[in-house]
Amino acid sequence: MSQLSLSWLGLWPVAASPWLLLLLVGASWLLAHVLAWTYAFYDNCRRLRCFPQPPRRNWFWGHQGMVNPTEEGMRVLTQLVATYPQGFKVWMGPISPLLSLCHPDIIRSVINASAAIAPKDKFFYSFLEPWLGDGLLLSAGDKWSRHRRMLTPAFHFNILKPYMKIFNESVNIMHAKWQLLASEGSACLDMFEHISLMTLDSLQKCVFSFDSHCQEKPSEYIAAILELSALVSKRHHEILLHIDFLYYLTPDGQRFRRACRLVHDFTDAVIQERRRTLPSQGVDDFLQAKAKSKTLDFIDVLLLSKDEDGKKLSDEDIRAEADTFMFEGHDTTASGLSWVLYHLAKHPEYQERCRQEVQELLKDREPKEIEWDDLAHLPFLTMCMKESLRLHPPVPVISRHVTQDIVLPDGRVIPKGIICLISVFGTHHNPAVWPDPEVYDPFRFDPENIKERSPLAFIPFSAGPRNCIGQTFAMAEMKVVLALTLLRFRVLPDHTEPRRKPELVLRAEGGLWLRVEPLS
C-alpha cells in the first residue's frame, strides 16, 4: 500500500534512491538560500533608494573605476562630495551596494555605534590578517573590547613621557643625514622615504627597546615591514589576486609569506627573551629595573597586562598587538609629517611663524630638545599640523559593516548588512562643513573658530569607540619632529606639484619631494 501511495505521488523513484533524496534536499536548501538572498537584496535595494547615487559607468561594473587611487580619482571624489554633501550610494558590480558617508551628522550614527553593531569590514582589512593577526585593528566583538581595555594603559601619559627622548634621538639621526646631504647648500629629499625610516626607528625602540640603526644601515626587519605594506597596497588593485590560493602562487604572494615569517620571528624572539627575563627577576624587580631606565616599552606593558579576571595576553596576542602597532604607527605618522612639511614649504609665512614659536620656546635651553611639557606650548604649530591633517588625512577612508539597521537623524535607515565607507577625506573636503575646503588655513583651528564646529568634522584619527588608540603618541611624535625640523632647516617646495595617491595611507606618486636648507 505504501509503495502504491509513493508511486501515485510520483516519489517512489526518489524513495528508492537515497542519492536522489539527498540531491532533492540539497537542491531545496540551495533554492531556499537563493530565494532568501534575492529577497534580502531587493529589500535592501528598496530601502537604499532614499540615498542618492551618481550615474553608473554601466549596469555590470556599476561605479567601479569612477574614483581611482590617483590624483584624478581624488578630484572626482571632491566633486562627488560637493554634489552629494550628505553622502551617496555606489555599486561595486551589479549586486554590491556601498554607502559613502561624508557629513558629520550622518557619520555620527555609524561611527559612534558600538563595535558589535558597526565592526570594521573584513573585506577592506583581510589582506593584513596573515601579518597582523587578531590585533586591535582586525579583531571584533568581545576580544576587541577586552584587548582595548588592556592596552589603554600602554598609552597613558606616564608611559608616553619617556618616549620623548627616543623621538628626539631619532629625529637627530635623520637631521644629521640631511646636514650631510645638504652640505652644498640644499638637498632635494623624498620626505616619505626619510620620515618612514625615522618613525620605524622610533617605533622599534618604543615597542621592543631595540636599536637596529635602520636610519644608518639596512635592516632586514625594517625592510620586511616596508615590503609588506607595499605588497598589501598592490594586492588591493589586482582583483583576481584577492583569492588567497591564487595570490600565494605568485611571486608577490611568496614574498609576502617570507616577509611575514621574518617579522613574526623577530617579534616572537623578543617576546620569548622578555618572558625568560620576567620570571627570573619577578614582576616587582622587573618594574624597578625598568624604572631606573625610565622607559617601559610596549612589550613590557603587554606582558604585564591583565584583564578584570586576572588573565594575561597569550604570546600570539602580544605578537599581534606589537605587529599592529609597528604597522599603524609608521606609515600614518610619516604621511602626516610629509604633508604638513609640504604645506609649510608652500606657505613660508606660516613656516616662519612656527619657527619663531619653537625658537622662543627653546631660546635658553641646551641641548635643543622638545620635552613633554613643551607640547602644550606650540599652539600655532599644532594648528598648522591639524589643518594639514584635514587636507591630507593619512587614512582617507574607514569601512564599517553594519550588523543591524541604523536609523539616521533625518529618518533614513541604513539596512543591516550594508558596508559603509566613512570618507575621512570627503568629510574634511566637504564645502557644507568647511568653507573654501581646498584652501590651507591653519586659523580654522584657532580655539575661537572650533567652538561651533561638530567634533566629527575633523576625524584624522577616526572617532567613537574604535578611534585610534595611539593618537596621543602620534601627535607627540609629530610635534617633536616638526618643531626640531623647522628649528634646523628651511623647507622649500620642489618644482613639481605632488600627485596624491591613496593606498593604505595617503601618499604621493613617486614620493613627496621637498628641498631642505640648513639654517646654521
Curated annotation (Swiss-Prot):
CDD domains: CYP4F. Liver. Also present in kidney: specifically expressed in the S2 and S3 segments of proximal tubules in cortex and outer medulla. It is an enzyme of class 1 (oxidoreductase). Keywords: Endoplasmic reticulum, Fatty acid metabolism, Heme, Iron, Lipid metabolism, Membrane, Metal-binding, Microsome, Monooxygenase, Oxidoreductase. It is a peripheral membrane protein. InterPro entries: Cyt_P450 (IPR001128), Cyt_P450_CS (IPR017972), Cyt_P450_E_grp-I (IPR002401), Cyt_P450_sf (IPR036396), Cytochrome_P450_Monoox (IPR050196). It is found in: Microsome membrane; Endoplasmic reticulum membrane. It catalyses: an organic molecule + reduced [NADPH--hemoprotein reductase] + O2 = an alcohol + oxidized [NADPH--hemoprotein reductase] + H2O + H(+); (5Z,8Z,11Z,14Z)-eicosatetraenoate + reduced [NADPH--hemoprotein reductase] + O2 = 20-hydroxy-(5Z,8Z,11Z,14Z)-eicosatetraenoate + oxidized [NADPH--hemoprotein reductase] + H2O + H(+); (5Z,8Z,11Z)-eicosatrienoate + reduced [NADPH--hemoprotein reductase] + O2 = 20-hydroxy-(5Z,8Z,11Z)-eicosatrienoate + oxidized [NADPH--hemoprotein reductase] + H2O + H(+); (5Z,8Z,11Z,14Z,17Z)-eicosapentaenoate + reduced [NADPH--hemoprotein reductase] + O2 = 20-hydroxy-(5Z,8Z,11Z,14Z,17Z)-eicosapentaenoate + oxidized [NADPH--hemoprotein reductase] + H2O + H(+). Its EC number is 1.14.14.1, 1.14.14.79, 1.14.14.94, 1.14.14.78. Heme binds at E328, C468. Its cofactor is heme. Pfam families: p450. Pathway: Lipid metabolism; arachidonate metabolism; Lipid metabolism; leukotriene B4 degradation; Cofactor degradation; phylloquinone degradation. One of its GO terms (biological process) is very long-chain fatty acid metabolic process. This is Cytochrome P450 4F2.
